[in-house]
Amino acid sequence: METDPILKVEREPEFTPSPAPEAIVKDIEQGVAPVSQNEPDRPQHWITRVVIIVLIVLAWYFFSLLLSMMNKWIFSESKMDFQFPLFLSSCQMLVQMGFAKLTILAFPRYQPNKKDNFSWLEYFYRAGICALVTGLDIGLSNASLETITLSFYTMCRSSILIFVFFFSVIFRIEMFDWILLCITLVISAGVVLMVATETQFVLSGFLLVMASSVLSGLRWALTQKLLLDHPWTSNPFTSLFALTPLMFLFLLVAGLIFEGPVRFIESPAWKEFGPFMSVVILVPGTLAFFMVASEFGLIQKTSIVTLSVCGILKEIITIIASTLFYHDILLPINIVGLVITLCGIGVYNYYRITKGNKKEAEKEVEYIVLNENA
């Protein structure tokens, strides 16, 4: 079984034909054309595999798009206007922790070996730093949706790749590469075109989403350094179970400081939406977990090239959906900037996969694709 480097998942092995039976060998030696007993099954096997992959991709798109749309609806000033993204994000961490634990219990192959457990000191050092940065990344990105459009948010989050490249060089995970620098500059130009002509530009929202993108790049570097080589966090479910308790604590403390417990308790949303608030608290965390699970399945079943292409299509679908449902306005220059950025991302991924350290490239590309809408 081949092991995926970022999530250490076992990919399905490629088809390898079994040795020919003696009867078939004799037929070949005698000039008789053998009839393959497996031949009728091959098209059916191929079709089944394609159907499974398509269903996984659709599930990934569904959960990702629904999560983005729901977060925008919850936090937008013109919609629900629930002004507590940090508190709500902390609740989502508890939901994801519960689902992660249930998955580990239900599927023993995801259970880590007890001898590989973190010591408490190691846990707070390794997981604590990653959880703090990840929690801030998610909290700030959710907070930005209060004031900026979903399409603008998605375009800004596409800049994650720039910061992944920057921090990979700073932390000496990757050697400096002039070609990659040129590609990231092209992507930066595309982001500038998207941002400079935004018709509903709000500086505070822009700063929040860009800060979350910077933290996402830092999060990638810290994850490479502190977590991925540890056997206890060898798959996304044990990683979630390790990180979410600390992420909950960090986000809760941040919510108490910046949003205030009294304002949270006395929010008019509790009276206005009543029992629906339980949906607001539980559903986003559930969607986030199943998005991670579908990503995991996609990584198992496909190549990194397929994942990269699907990730770019996901960005386009999210932006189209935001223009249809939330009536976001895109000017021609926005679209030009978006095309430049997405093409730059495609070229970057292709270069990283075909040149240099292939294992590190696959880890980086997977992270970028799966976290643009985190």
Swiss-Prot record:
Membrane topology listed for this record: Multi-pass membrane protein
GO BP terms in the entry: triose phosphate transmembrane transport; UDP-glucose transmembrane transport
GO cellular component, one term: Golgi membrane
One Pfam family here: TPT
InterPro entries: Sugar_P_trans_dom (IPR004853), TPT_transporter (IPR050186)
UniProt entry keywords in alphabetical sequence: Membrane, Sugar transport, Transmembrane, Transmembrane helix, Transport
An annotated Gene Ontology molecular function: triose-phosphate transmembrane transporter activity
Localization (cell): Membrane
TM ranges: 50-70, 151-171, 175-195, 201-221, 238-258, 273-293, 329-349
Stated family: Belongs to the TPT transporter family. SLC35C subfamily.
Protein name: Uncharacterized transporter C22E12.01
